[in-house]
Amino acid sequence: MEEGNNNEEVIHLNNFHCHRGQDFVIFFWKTQIIQREKTESL
């Protein structure tokens, strides 16, 4: 039973890592757009 719980924990961590990765990509994409707008306004 302990092995099963460990497997669920690993899957949960993998899903969490994937979601964090997506958030980081979106955050990076937004910051790139903001930087572009600032340079264009100058």
Swiss-Prot record:
Protein name in the entry: Putative protein RNF216-like
